Amino acid sequence: MADRFRLIRCGSIAAVTLLCAVSVHGAEADASYADARKAFQDAYARVAANFPDESAADSEALKSYPLYPYLEAARIRQALNGSPDSLARADQLAADFIAAHEQAPVSRGLRRAFLDSLARRSRWGLFIEAYRESGATDAERCQSFTAHIELGKTAGLAGDIARQWLTPRSLPECDRPFAWLKANGLLTPDLIEKRVRLALEIGNVAFARQIIQQLPADGVGPYLQWASLLEHPQGGLDTLIASPDLAVDPMALLAGWTRLARTNPAAASERYQALMSARGLTREAASPYALALALSLAWNHDPAALEYFDLVASRDFDDSSLEWRARAAILAADWKVASESIVAMSENNRQTARWRYWAARAAAQLHDSSQARRLYESLLSDDNYYSAMAAARLHRTVIPLLQTLPPDQELLASIERVPAMERARELFLCGMRQEALAEWQLGYGSLSEAQRLQSIRVAAAWRWYDQAIAVASAQRVFNDYVLLYPRPFDTEVEQAARLAQLEPGLIYGVLRQESLYRVDAVSSADARGLMQLQLDTARRTARQWKRPKPDLSDLFDPATSTLLGAARLRTLLDQFDGQIPVALAAYNAGANAVVRWLPAKSVDSDVWIENIPYGETRGYVQRILWHVLTFTWLHTKEAQETKSWLSPIRAIPRTDADNRALAGVAHRQGPG
């Protein structure tokens, strides 16, 4: 690996100081394009604000700016929303622009807008000319079917529409093609049943009920029963227990059982034997039911999980379920079952750092100290949470293995001369990240392997840190900690650390994991900014800490985000008795969830972390612990002690407020 990446192993951070070069070429480009960039941003903003077309006033400098086509595309999109008498010209402009930039990222957004406009206006001939199957969305594909139907070009179309029909979700853009399929007698009961099953298999009950209505009356019963089992699993299963002769689709029965096991494992446990007996299921046939219940019990830290795992046939285990059997055994301190579960995993899974660590823990508990030591030592060079845990078990300190990717100025300059990379940089500087990523991907695809490695440094020099880290991951460059663990927000982090009385390394660890340094990051849950705070959480924290009430835009301010994020973390640390892994889990999953996960009595921290039910949260805690170690090592240049990682997770008495919160919160469950 070292030869391929031309990495330099360094015993100290000082040895690589001279290697941390910033792209001189990028700085020169930044200066040379400054005026044109400002003109572009101003003009682009005026288009977004729906100002009239001002292209006649564009300067030659603006026209020669690499992003000028993006301004042209924006103006054409604006024209496509213009008055009816101007649309013919807009259509021609759009068609000409797309033809001139057929393969370029700049045409993608315009093509989508053009197709949408043509579909709304039923300009089907132009639609077919502009449509490309490659990269088309489901909606655009449906619109293309409509175009062919309206133009009478239906040869071979039925098979394509039938394939599109087989989706488990609503596709309103395909209403016309599906109606055409039905009118031509091609929407058969078999096709309808297949779509109903697809919807039911993913739990999309409301949509399944809509499609069920299209079935012949004598065919709806089994599917309505399936839907009812998903909506009301406990009542439906009780009916099937009370009426052993009542027919039920085997997939519907298992789906209803799985839904009950996940939402109410206690109720499922009470009914397991009765259901198996009533339906006449042999031990072999009952195995999937035992597995569904065992998994849910394991996610809920119920020791009965192991009893049901014992009822599962070996053929029904996969790596994911074996992992949860191992976790349940680890939590129950049944190290023999834990070891057996690890041995049963696939070779690839068994050799991961996670399961080598737990194999070592099991060996130690089963008094095979030599095997435990061998496995622990095999982990030490892995540089991750498990290697640090192994070091703690061996009473050793941790020094991350620094492998530096040295800069090659010739390659760096060659990368920045690639037109797509130049556009990517300018788009990034203009805050157009989605477009910047598309141009980066185009440019990256044209690079040599050596250039791709150096492109990590290019992105980092641009301060596009999340992209640098993403490319480094793709190139398997994990250990250039100087490059991949920057500290661009030291002023803000230090201020937040003083306020919340936290170590800066802890704040940086959370910041890196939450946003990868993206000031403008927005999650699917509408968490925003460097520390990924939702507005209500930020305002509640500000009120508690007597800080100004933030608006939504304030969450993108680095100082506000780091300060309120650190304050939130401090509040969670205080709530959970200073236990960092618990507070981190609460920062990610919410305090109410973590209250449910707290042990009734003290448990080893590695055991508790491994049994966090949400895979995202488990990985989140583990990665941040490693990030904190790395940031602290970079700052202090000292070997890091991890013996504190072994401190048990202590039970914390629940308050009345905790109990009220638990009563009002649905338990999101699922393996991970």
Regions found by a protein language model. Give the residues of each.
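Alpha-helical repeat scaffolds
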Residues: 54-59, 86-99, 124-133, 155-166, ...
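Alpha-helical adaptor scaffolds
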Residues: 76-77, 98-99, 111-116, 289-302, ...
